[in-house]
Amino acid sequence: MIEFVYPHTHLVAGVDEVGRGPLVGAVVTAAVILDPARPIVGLNDSKKLSEKRRLSLYDEIKEKALSWSLGRAEAHEIDELNILHATMLAMQRAVAGLHIAPEYVLIDGNRCPELPVPSMAVVKGDSRVAEISAASILAKVTRDAEMAALDIVFPQYGFAQHKGYPTAFHLEKLAQYGATAHHRRSFAPVKRALGLVS
């Protein structure tokens, strides 16, 4: 990881999101406070890890972290608020769910939600800050599992493969079968499938 200079505080939470780009399902966030006495080897951006390694780290993070929490904003909230505001809301929910209050929050990306504690956005934080990497892994494994579950209910869309992202296959099936109740109606490809835009 590129060296990151931590704020002078003890209880640092890392926050990341997964699922801003997909056309279906929730945006899922996680907040993690790691335990310095129980280091976790191999934390890295969850997108760069194999699925097997991610699943192994997911269990280890949940076991060793001082506190962890998941947050989410559902498809209907994304449609009501827009994806940016829904993501900020989901991040607030993840931080609020921590059973230990952090002294400082580090958030992946370039903007922070309003929080009751000091926070800082860290560009490429998922590959620079261990707490954000851990949050990224929890959020991704959780959302991927939700897409696999949705795939069982709607096998024709291939959600387990593309995780709801707008792949050519997903767009083809959206045009063929229309949108499910889980699709984000404010996203242009879904609007087109519903005949809401030409």
Curated annotation (Swiss-Prot):
Residues 10-198 form the RNase H type-2 domain. GO terms for cellular component: cytoplasm; ribonuclease H2 complex. Manganese or magnesium. Binds 1 divalent metal ion per monomer in the absence of substrate. May bind a second metal ion after substrate binding. GO terms for biological process: DNA replication, removal of RNA primer; mismatch repair. Its EC number is 3.1.26.4. It catalyses: Endonucleolytic cleavage to 5'-phosphomonoester. Endonuclease that specifically degrades the RNA of RNA-DNA hybrids. Keywords: Cytoplasm, Endonuclease, Hydrolase, Manganese, Metal-binding, Nuclease. The keyword Hydrolase applies. It comes from the Bacteria. Belongs to the RNase HII family. SUPFAM superfamilies: Ribonuclease H-like (SSF53098). This is Ribonuclease HII. One of its GO terms (molecular function) is RNA binding. Its cofactor is Mn(2+); Mg(2+). NCBIfam families: PRK00015.1-1, PRK00015.1-3, PRK00015.1-4. A divalent metal cation binds at D16, E17, D108. It is found in: Cytoplasm.
